[in-house]
């Protein structure tokens, strides 16, 4: 870590071999707090691996909580959210992902992309969830959330018990 004396903040710097330069990793946002690319800012896409065909695509998350109220009111749900993490798919055909900035673990039907459920998270899910089964037969989905970084969040591991059918 190195301190940026102008801004009074610490940043992670990485040296670049063979050059006298260093790199500062950060998320590039506009002065209003919006990403510097046109929407959508995040989507979840299902692809048929045999044909390469896109089966469905849905907006993933929302990031209105990071914006001033006036700006957040202009954000549309279909824009999605920047995200950090990936999905898992259960044997029952449910896709779980919590990578967006909206503080939800989402569950989608793998065939249609329809959202089946969402569970609240104390911070943004910035990891890929995992699924496990305990000796009693109950199945859980867990995800690490938070992790500091550019959005200054806490650290948690959250688990949800899945309903048996």
Regions found by a protein language model. Give the residues of each.
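Beta-sheet-rich non-transmembrane sensory/scaffold domains
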Residues: 1-165
């Amino acid at each position: 870590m190195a301190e940026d004396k102008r801004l009074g903040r610490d940043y992670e710097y990485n040296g670049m071999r063979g050059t006298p330069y260093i790199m500062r990793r950060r998320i590039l946002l506009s002065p209003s707090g919006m990403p510097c690319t046109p929407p959508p800012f995040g989507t979840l896409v299902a692809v048929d691996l045999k044909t390469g065909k896109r089966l469905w695509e849905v907006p993933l998350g929302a990031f209105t909580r990071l914006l001033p109220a006036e700006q957040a009111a202009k954000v549309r749900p279909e824009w999605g959210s920047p995200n950090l993490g990936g999905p898992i798919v259960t044997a029952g055909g449910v896709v779980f992902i919590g990578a967006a900035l909206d503080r939800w673990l989402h569950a989608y039907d793998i065939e249609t992309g329809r959202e089946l459920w969402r569970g609240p998270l104390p911070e943004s899910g910035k990891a890929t969830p995992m699924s496990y089964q305990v000796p009693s037969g109950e199945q859980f989905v867990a995800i690490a959330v938070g992790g500091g970084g550019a959005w200054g969040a806490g650290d948690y591991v959250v688990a949800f018990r899945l309903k048996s059918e």
